[in-house]
Amino acid sequence: MPEVKVPELAESITEGTIAEWLKNVGDSVEKGEAILELETDKVNVEVVSEEAGVLSEQLASEGDTVEVGQAIAIIGEGSGNASKENSNDNTPQQNEETNNKKEETTNNSVDKAEVNQANDDNQQRINATPSARRYARENGVNLAEVSPKTNDVVRKEDIDKKQQAPASTQTTQQAPAKEEKKYNQYPTKPVIREKMSRRKKTAAKKLLEVSNNTAMLTTFNEVDMTNVMELRKRKKEQFMKDHDGTKLGFMSFFTKASVAALKKYPEVNAEIDGDDMITKQYYDIGVAVSTDDGLLVPFVRDCDKKNFAEIEAEIANLAVKAREKKLGLDDMVNGSFTITNGGIFGSMMSTPIINGNQAAILGMHSIITRPIAIDQDTIENRPMMYIALSYDHRIIDGKEAVGFLKTIKELIENPEDLLLES
């Protein structure tokens, strides 16, 4: 019988976690229909069946880690049940038998309540993130009783809020879980223990790999933002009119400045592959986006060929896709350089960590008005920004790193030169 295997996703992705089965055993499956959702360190993807038939067997469970090419389901012949939801509604006897079997193994009323809640979850599709579904199962929470805070999507923080509500039933349900947890080193201190999401675990692993496998250094400079702020103030209204409402932000200036600096210092646009150094001849710039699930870095492709409006529009589009969990793998791989802006959170200075398979990352920070010596006799208040370049010293020498950052500074302080470059 045909097998469904974990598909090739991207060169850097070798495994994933089954977030949710969209089909039950016995359900009918159409060719090209999604049967499960797979969580990777970058995005969630739906795995589809290449054959029509019936889902005969699930070879892995929700929460299991599976590798690319691994068989995860078997598709048999027949018509099967209409859908996951209908299969539960149309077979009440099977549900009752399942409940009876589970009740035979325990007389605990809490376990019985959790079984009933699990059946309720199957009968009604709740709009929730995969991590929230898994978190709810682990903590015996009925998603139907959780009120989402934003966008009608249940998230982990909504479940936490539900659990913290003063209800005696919740206290009863949570008691056994607390007895099983082994964190009694400080029994008088309140703590919370929870499993890390796959994306969080992968990010932690990769950050540690970067720290261990690169000779990372950071160099700093400061930028006088006066001219670029004045130019933006003069042009922003006309810019929006000319480009269908696209706003002129600072990211397009720093992106175009980065492209110019990368052309001047090509080793910053490189990476090490074994004993070889690969210098990239393209300029796909990653823009870090903060989401509820952590930091994501989608890439704006071919920034050397795009104007300010195209870059701003694409950054805005990628940010929306990231927050709505609609990024594809094509948005997340094969970049050449990354820009991160800690200033939106109020950061004055930081040492950003290099993104995988890259040689450097540019860090932007808060714009702070402070006194600056213009010359020996003049001090003025100027809007200043600290910028940082973290780089792999195996590829980039200190002289080139300082020169790269100085080029960024000069172009931002003289934005007309950037317009001429474009």
Curated annotation (Swiss-Prot):
PROSITE patterns with a match to the protein in the record: BIOTINYL_LIPOYL, LIPOYL, PSBD
Start and end residues of each Peripheral subunit-binding (PSBD) domain: 127-163
GO biological process: L-lysine catabolic process to acetyl-CoA via saccharopine; tricarboxylic acid cycle
Enzyme Commission (EC) number: 2.3.1.61
UniProt biased composition (Low complexity): 164-176
Organism superkingdom: Bacteria
Compositional bias segments (type: Polar residues): 80-94, 116-130
Listed SUPFAM superfamilies: CoA-dependent acyltransferases, Single hybrid motif
Pathway: Amino-acid degradation; L-lysine degradation via saccharopine pathway; glutaryl-CoA from L-lysine: step 6/6
Catalytic reactions on record: N(6)-[(R)-dihydrolipoyl]-L-lysyl-[protein] + succinyl-CoA = N(6)-[(R)-S(8)-succinyldihydrolipoyl]-L-lysyl-[protein] + CoA
Keywords: Acyltransferase, Lipoyl, Transferase, Tricarboxylic acid cycle
CDD domains on file: lipoyl_domain (cd06849)
Top EC group: transferase
Cofactor(s), names only, from the UniProt record: (R)-lipoate
Residues modified to N6-lipoyllysine: K42
Single Gene Ontology MF annotation: dihydrolipoyllysine-residue succinyltransferase activity
Cofactor details (free text): Binds 1 lipoyl cofactor covalently.
InterPro entries cross-referenced by the UniProt entry: 2-oxoA_DH_lipoyl-BS, 2-oxoacid_dehydrogenase, 2-oxoacid_DH_actylTfrase, Biotin_lipoyl, CAT-like_dom_sf, E3-bd_dom_sf, PSBD, Single_hybrid_motif
Record region (Disordered): 77-184
Compositional bias annotation for Basic and acidic residues: 152-163
Catalytic residues as annotated in Swiss-Prot or TrEMBL: H393, D397
Oligomeric form and interacting partners: Forms a 24-polypeptide structural core with octahedral symmetry. Part of the 2-oxoglutarate dehydrogenase (OGDH) complex composed of E1 (2-oxoglutarate dehydrogenase), E2 (dihydrolipoamide succinyltransferase) and E3 (dihydrolipoamide dehydrogenase); the complex contains multiple copies of the three enzymatic components (E1, E2 and E3).
Main function: E2 component of the 2-oxoglutarate dehydrogenase (OGDH) complex which catalyzes the second step in the conversion of 2-oxoglutarate to succinyl-CoA and CO(2).
UniProt protein name: Dihydrolipoyllysine-residue succinyltransferase component of 2-oxoglutarate dehydrogenase complex
UniProt source species: Staphylococcus aureus (strain N315)
